[in-house]
Amino acid sequence: MAAAYSTVGAVNRAPLSLNGSGARASLVPSTAFFGSSLKKSAAKFPKASSGNFKIVAQEISEDQQTDKDKWKGLAYDISDDQQDITRGKGMVDTLFQAPMQSGTHYAVMSSYDYISQGLRQYNLDNNMDGFYIAPAFMDKLVVHITKNFLSLPNIKIPLILGIWGGKGQGKSFQCELVFAKMGINPIMMSAGELESGNAGEPAKLIRQRYREAADIIKKGKMCCLFINDLDAGAGRMGGTTQYTVNNQMVNATLMNIADNPTNVQLPGMYNKEENPRVPIIVTGNDFSTLYAPLIRDGRMEKFYWAPTREDRIGVCKGIFRTDNVADDDIVKLVDTFPGQSIDFFGALRARVYHDEVRKWVSEVGVDTIGKKLVNSKEGPPSFEQPKMTIDKLLGYGGMLVQEQENVKRVQLADKYMSEAALGDANNDAIKRGTFYGGQAAQQVGNVPVPEGCTDPQATNYDPTARSDDGSCVYKF
């Protein structure tokens, strides 16, 4: 046992040979510790000269560099500080974060991933595509936008332009054509965004969209805030609608922005940095439903849009510009339906395609429409452009007018509301005089009101009394 211990110690004391340096491998003793079949060989690696050792970095070859290369960032700086800060939101100490998207973590919309949801971009030229812009409409809109970007001395310029008029007269589309003509990508809002289940959210959204437009202007590009159908979201449509806190906040926010257009802050975050002035364009059908101080002349410039005969003809030429309809036929079509809105002629053009759709349905069968339209390898069907003659257009126009007259003539809603769900069953009650026609009991004069003592502290208190007759008796 002692001999084995000394042998192991001899092995541990033997010098180790690496790369041919030091003692040779043949000096390793042959002991029983390594076994009888151990093959002993010496390493033959050449020695590396420490004086001539160099590390050379190869220059970057842009041909070999691809977008899929995960190490691309080592050669080029592809980071975005704003996006990196935003990604770190919620991952660092909240002490260094401003609340409500107002601190450094709130990235300025500068890349495609951060384009505002309300930003509308146009890819058309109204001159090339043949769209018609009414001269009066364009003059009003261009002048309002231009003077809001000018520094006019000692002049208070209304920030808001309210364009109102009848339904379907092309107010929104004419605005978009003017924006495209001027090279403006507006920040869009609709009436549906002016109400929310949370109090104050629509007012905050207006301020956010206004500041987004201000950021675009700060970068050197014209922008404006465009709100569609303001009266539908913030107006009062009689007793059938409820006036909520959000309605009040929307009106108050627009009034405040109109008074201080260069100092629009988000709730709870205030700084002294001024933002660029952003013109606001709103559309609606009846601005008398809005809060009166909002539409006063110092805050809102109002423009009533009623297209003339020339405007209607010009717009209709743009509607039928690809259908090879003669100009004389368009004039005849407009004169035949003088009381209709411009939207009527767009619906009239769409009605002409009914024959083509009906023909295609008869060919493929009603039971296979879903497979052909939604889950088809061939894709949706394509139709040849139908020939639009003046006789066909006048015929379909007459059908649309007849449908409008039926709605106004029948008025089933009034019939349902007056007769409730009982229909003719109310006739007997009406004849007997016991049917109040939906009026409350307090509104009918012949309903008796019980009198008596209504004071609970009195000894003769009558809980069924609805009017005090002065007969209360008190015990002292």
Swiss-Prot record:
ATP binds at residues 165-172. It comes from the Eukaryota. This is Ribulose bisphosphate carboxylase/oxygenase activase 1, chloroplastic. The lineage of its organism: Eukaryota, Viridiplantae, Streptophyta, Embryophyta, Tracheophyta. Pfam families: AAA, RuBisCO_activase_AAA_helical. One of its GO terms (cellular component) is chloroplast stroma. Disulfide bonds: none annotated. Activation of RuBisCO (ribulose-1,5-bisphosphate carboxylase/oxygenase; EC 4.1.1.39) involves the ATP-dependent carboxylation of the epsilon-amino group of lysine leading to a carbamate structure. Residues 1-56 form a transit peptide. GO terms for molecular function: ATP binding; ATP hydrolysis activity; ribulose-1,5-bisphosphate carboxylase/oxygenase activator activity. Belongs to the RuBisCO activase family. Keywords: ATP-binding, Chloroplast, Nucleotide-binding, Plastid, Transit peptide. Its main location: plastid. It comes from Larrea tridentata.
